[in-house]
């Protein structure tokens, strides 16, 4: 029997506000433990919350960008549970009436088809504190308690781990582009839980689901869902009874581990938050927020294809972050060679950024300098290989490429006469290579070209070298 997965994702995104959702404490990441706290976020007796207007604005903005309907009347609710990282013993969230409903994200499948993944709801809530487990015991840091979140709950429309990854990548790029969250998964500002079950292909009856936590990267998400799918299929095939449960992804051993049996909604005893009034959102406010939404990544990618003529794949990669998209667009316009700009950014520049673990905003050079480098290569002033060396220098120093070329004497040699002398000398000293070439070994020419480039320290024009080596070899 063939099975298919039924997957839904719950994504928590920390909002990029300066202060917490119900108090004036800073949301800055990385402070000394328990220094960004006050009576309100610690839940001390007599303290009263006050809803941060910017949080509501960001909730509306996210909803509009994700094609949701905005609930013009919504409220906050208490979710009651006891855990050390929850100082009030309840979390202020939204239960029955969230701020947004009924949206979707459109992803592109491997075969080029588009698929809509429904979004059931988006609700606002406060984050919990952070537990640090040591050999001596467990420590609690409440700096994160009260940091504003939106939780984006998808419908169970996802059928493969690969689709889940595409959905999360698209969601991350949208939230980053509208600047409601920095979406730094390594810092926990974008966290994803997955719900998965399996059913026979063609069936409409979902199986017993598991919730998976601790998936803090795209790779972890895909691996965890794949593992859990296989576990479910094996259990169902053997006739075992699956139970609804919460599991965590163990990265070190590449398995999911049981945490607890899954709670039900009534275990949390939700009821309206009495310290906060019902929230009324006007049409005027919604339209004001709508005007602040910039061009979204998929819209920008489509424009890049039409305007610059780059491949769709390039456009999708370049628009994953707005910093990269902006850098590309400025470089393409200034260099007047969009495809080459795309190649540099997706190739050598991305490789160097990964090696140094930096982002586009950390680069020491700007789009104008990269455009200048492209123009130097296109004009034949330097070769592509020399261009890579210049780029390495730009990464370290931030100097203009022209200055680097002049300082290091890297100008390309286009003098055919001078290059011909080197070619003749190389051929004369390597008779075996000529013999190999005559015997049909085409690689022998490449060997000779390499020797010429080495002799000229990479400064000879490669096109001229190739032409002259071929001409001289054929004369022999």
From Swiss-Prot:
Its EC number is 6.3.5.-. GO terms for biological process: glutaminyl-tRNAGln biosynthesis via transamidation; translation. The keyword Zinc-finger does not apply. SUPFAM superfamilies: GatB/YqeY motif, Glutamine synthetase/guanido kinase. Keywords: ATP-binding, Ligase, Nucleotide-binding, Protein biosynthesis. One of its GO terms (molecular function) is asparaginyl-tRNA synthase (glutamine-hydrolyzing) activity. Allows the formation of correctly charged Asn-tRNA(Asn) or Gln-tRNA(Gln) through the transamidation of misacylated Asp-tRNA(Asn) or Glu-tRNA(Gln) in organisms which lack either or both of asparaginyl-tRNA or glutaminyl-tRNA synthetases. The reaction takes place in the presence of glutamine and ATP through an activated phospho-Asp-tRNA(Asn) or phospho-Glu-tRNA(Gln). Heterotrimer of A, B and C subunits. NCBIfam families: gatB, PRK05477.1-2, PRK05477.1-4. This is Aspartyl/glutamyl-tRNA(Asn/Gln) amidotransferase subunit B. It comes from Clostridium botulinum (strain Okra / Type B1).
